[in-house]
Amino acid sequence: MTTYNLSKKSEIWKEIPIEGFEKYMVSNFGNVKNINTDKILSQSNRGGYFSVYLKPKDIDAQQKKIHRLVALTFVKNKDPENKKVVNHINGDKLDNRAENLEWVTASENVQHAVDNNLITMTKRAVIQCNLKTGKKIKEFESVTDASNETGISTGHICDAANGKWKQAGGYAWKYSKKDSAKIDIDMSKFKQLVDFPNYLINNEGQVYSLARKRFMKPIHRGDSGMNISLSEGDKQKTMLVHKLVASYFLKKNNDDHNHVRHKDGNRQNNNVSNLEWCYLGGMDKHKPESHFSHDYYDEKTAIPLTERKKAVKTIKSSGSKTSKSIGSKTNKSAGSKTASKLGSKTAIKSGSKTTSKISTKSGSKTAIKSGSKTASKISTKSGSKTSKTSKSIKYYEV
């Protein structure tokens, strides 16, 4: 996580705009305090996000995520009906400065993570043990491998390995102590499901759940093919994997086509290269009583894959009016009208009478002045490792 030197003089405090929480204030830096005691409250890391316990009027204490409190108080939401998710612009979930937050839709939030490579896949070895003796039976490279060999669902194995359940499939399970292995997966090949934004699918038929942090295991339903159960809040739906793949990666050449056929006859081979749209008599896509006959095709998403451009990871100043990019000298001050970038890398703002340091690749040393009585230093090392402003979210493949 990047450390920022933030001046107290540029810290702005406002009351939290939630009914019943009037005695609390939050700052644009992500601090929370009690108005009556003027005491800044301690925060805890819960699931990768900083949160704080607040005691509203006549109600038990509630846990609130800091980034949502800051966004509700300082970040304008132009489309509150659709944009209900708070996104960290630089990818660092612990950086809760107001200028690093934005309101987005669930789809935009996932797409941001994919485009900026903030989803890192790893696989974690798991050990199958005798339920009575605890003796090791076999070690698998991943929960997926264990599930494929034993027939026990990945979810049940994970719950047992995490201690939620004592057993899964009649066996005890635990994770191996050896380091997790990183999987080289190109996330740019995945597309987000329109009606279920917490799921991604690629042209090989792999479906990844962002909520469960694992690949989903399809169920083989005989002649129907492989299907998968998706959920979003109270909404649940079972879909055929091959039709999902065709919907998102295979364009129809004829509007009369209403069926997806497996070229090799193997209904478990859902790679887009093995699928084709065709016409099947007797099927009426306007009759929704059978989800197996439902037409998932959406021409907006069924397009050839294009090379995604990675977004430039910059930190925008919420109070700035003008942005400039120059090659050598940079002016930058907290609350000023000018925000600047040095050589496409982001310069970190410093407050009045505050010294801040950042690391960047360059061949020389540059001293820059920012604001009134403020000095900023840039330490440079050619060919050395530089500090990153973004932090990867680590997901485990099971």
UniProtKB/Swiss-Prot annotation:
<dbReference type="InterPro" id="IPR003615">
    <property type="entry name" value="HNH_nuc"/>
</dbReference>
<keyword id="KW-0255">Endonuclease</keyword>
<protein>
    <recommendedName>
        <fullName>Uncharacterized HNH endonuclease L247</fullName>
        <ecNumber>3.1.-.-</ecNumber>
    </recommendedName>
</protein>
<feature type="compositionally biased region" description="Low complexity">
    <location>
        <begin position="314"/>
        <end position="333"/>
    </location>
</feature>
<dbReference type="Pfam" id="PF07463">
    <property type="entry name" value="NUMOD4"/>
</dbReference>
<dbReference type="GO" id="GO:0004519">
    <property type="term" value="F:endonuclease activity"/>
</dbReference>
<keyword id="KW-0540">Nuclease</keyword>
<dbReference type="Pfam" id="PF13392">
    <property type="entry name" value="HNH_3"/>
</dbReference>
<dbReference type="InterPro" id="IPR036388">
    <property type="entry name" value="WH-like_DNA-bd_sf"/>
</dbReference>
<keyword id="KW-0378">Hydrolase</keyword>
<feature type="region of interest" description="Disordered">
    <location>
        <begin position="313"/>
        <end position="398"/>
    </location>
</feature>
<dbReference type="InterPro" id="IPR003647">
    <property type="entry name" value="Intron_nuc_1_rpt"/>
</dbReference>
<feature type="compositionally biased region" description="Low complexity">
    <location>
        <begin position="343"/>
        <end position="398"/>
    </location>
</feature>
<dbReference type="InterPro" id="IPR010902">
    <property type="entry name" value="NUMOD4"/>
</dbReference>
<dbReference type="InterPro" id="IPR044925">
    <property type="entry name" value="His-Me_finger_sf"/>
</dbReference>
